[in-house]
A protein has these predicted regions:
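Secondary-shell segments that build the walls of catalytic and ion/ligand-binding clefts
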Residues: 1-107, 173-321
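Amphipathic alpha-helical scaffolding segments
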Residues: 145-153, 169, 264-269
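Long, hydrophobic/aromatic-enriched structural stretches that serve as scaffold segments
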Residues: 92-157
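Predominantly late transmembrane helices and immediately cytosolic-facing juxtamembrane segments
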Residues: 161-165
Length: 321
């Protein structure tokens, strides 16, 4: 409106507006701009519009720009090209050593919830890290889902190790066994069973510790705590805060994660930075974070079942690059 001569203002004010926020004292310039905008708001909204001045049509303008100009799709960034060969071999050898350490620590052929639980969680974490290292998931949304699983495994192991109580170890095992029985019973009476479920295998697992008919099936968290409180009790709230919230979005389909993995922004300024589909957006690699948490789980194994020294070498690949 100033440039069209419809509103007059002192030259110094015009210069401050045109060079905002790089000129003048902002404690004075900002209030002046706000007051000026409020003074002309009625003209723009129509309550005091001069005769012959057309009503603004912002939506029609943006609609025309969308219909008459093409989207500009940004070039997709390539995924990290950093080799993970050394890390992969280190995970493989460490996993092998971990399994050997388990065999050396078998004390009974009866149920041992402490050894099975601790080693099982750690072995599961390293197995998931291995899957990341041999697949494209390292740079995609599925890798974040795996990382989230590793985070929960680690917090659970740390909580169990800190308490180190036979009753709590058994509580963890019984809850998981009951959930297996529940899954079997639900699918037994279902009209259609998912192709990914092997009912014969599921039945064996459901009856492994005891007949499923004799098992208690609990609901909720096995420790009667949510994961955040479990992390606080285990003194690993730093892990929860750093990893859990964002990675959980990919598991639950939260908008932020969906937006990050499925869309990009149109670079045409006349399109107001709207979203356009871009499935398979490459993302920062997750393998290093997976390995860090795996090594922290191995620290717990070393304390529960001394001594265990092997660790995953995740730094050598980065050093080569």
């Amino acid at each position: 409106m100033i440039s069209c001569g419809r509103v007059h203002a002192p030259p110094e004010f015009i210069e401050q507006v045109s060079k905002y926020p790089n000129l003048g004292d902002m404690r004075q310039v900002r209030p002046s701009i706000r007051a000026f905008e409020m003074a002309i708001r009625n003209i723009e909204s129509g309550t005091e519009r001069p005769r012959g001045v057309l009503e603004p049509q912002p939506q029609k303008f943006w609609d025309e720009m969308m219909n008459d100009t093409a989207c500009i799709i940004p070039k997709r960034s390539p995924p990290d090209s950093l080799s993970v060969d050394v890390t992969r071999e280190s995970i493989k050898s460490t996993l092998h050593e971990l399994c050997d350490h388990f065999m050396r620590n078998i004390k009974t052929t009866s149920i041992d919830p402490r050894a099975d639980g601790a080693f099982g969680l750690a072995i599961n974490m390293l197995t998931l890290a291995m899957e990341v290292s041999v697949s494209p998931s390292n740079n995609f949304a599925s890798g974040r889902i795996i990382l989230r699983t590793i985070v929960e495994n680690y917090i659970t192991l740390k909580y169990l190790a800190k308490k180190d109580d036979d009753t709590i170890w058994m509580q963890y095992r019984n809850y998981g066994s009951g959930q297996t029985a529940l899954a079997f019973l639900k699918n037994t009476f279902a009209e259609e069973t998912p192709d990914s479920i092997d009912m014969e295998r599921l039945e064996i697992l459901a009856n492994e510790d005891a007949w499923l008919e004799t098992k208690d099936i609990a609901v909720g968290n096995w420790a009667k705590l949510d994961l955040r409180k479990m992390a606080i009790d285990a003194e690993v709230k730093d892990v929860y805060d750093a990893y859990y919230d964002w990675t959980s979005g990919f598991v639950h389909g939260h908008w932020g994660a969906v937006r990050d993995s499925s869309f990009t922004v149109c670079m045409n300024p006349l399109h107001r930075l709207h979203r356009v589909p871009a499935p398979g957006n490459p993302m920062p690699a997750v393998l290093t974070d997976c390995c860090k948490l795996c090594n922290r789980s191995l620290d717990e194994i070393g304390q529960l079942f001394p001594s265990f020294k092997p660790r995953i070498d995740w730094k050598s690949d980065g050093a080569k690059a």
